[in-house]
Regions:
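Catalytic beta-strand-to-alpha-helix segment of the class III nucleotidyl cyclase homology domain
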Residues: 82-179
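Catalytic NTP-binding/metal-coordinating core of nucleotidyl cyclase/transferase enzymes
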Residues: 2-107
Length: 179
């Protein structure tokens, strides 16, 4: 998917990236014209997701908030983690974020699909672009055709390579496969 980026390119960082899309959002929005309660529900859901960065902070992992970015726009969400943090294990933390968010959405009867990949990305506050985002979007569109989150092979390989310092390679592989 992603071609090699010139080594002198200092804009992109290597990141684990998830692109999530709320399914049927256009139809839901059309329904909000007639149903003010539904409009409030959608607003509350999007605010909840946008606040996930604040609400899901984990003080036991101090580097996490510097390594993670979350952006919400319309019916989509992007979460990224720099791949090489102080103790690695970024894919694990991304998967935990995704599982919490997806559980919250399912509880609210909101369905989604998404994709996780690894690659070059610029993601800072509200600005997000790069080959990894395009790849995640294309995987979401082409592979995740029903409610689920697909993890591509590149993300798994890099997740194992950049494993937590607390796990062996085999432990990390087993853990990632179980998720």
């Amino acid at each position: 998917m992603e071609e090699n980026i010139n080594k002198s390119n200092t804009v992109y960082r290597n990141c684990f990236v998830v692109f999530l899309d709320i399914m049927g959002f256009k139809n839901i929005i059309n329904e909000t014209k007639k149903d003010g309660d539904l409009a409030r529900k959608i607003k509350d859901i999007l605010i909840h997701i946008a606040n996930e960065k604040i609400n899901n902070d984990d003080e036991s992992v101090p580097w996490r908030n510097d390594a993670r970015n979350i952006s919400v726009f319309s019916d989509s969400m992007v979460i990224s983690y720099w791949s090489e943090t102080v103790i690695n294990g970024s894919l694990y933390h991304l998967l935990m974020d995704v599982s919490y968010i997806c559980s919250d959405l399912i509880e609210k009867d909101v369905f989604f699909r998404g994709a996780i990949t690894y690659g070059h990305l610029y993601h800072d506050k509200n600005i997000c672009f790069g080959p990894a985002l395009v790849d995640a979007y294309m995987i979401e569109e082409g592979v995740a055709v029903y409610p689920r989150v697909v993890i591509d092979d590149i993300a798994i390989e890099e997740g194992v390579r950049l494993k937590s310092v607390n796990n062996s390679t085999e432990e990390e592989k087993d853990f990632l496969k179980k998720l």
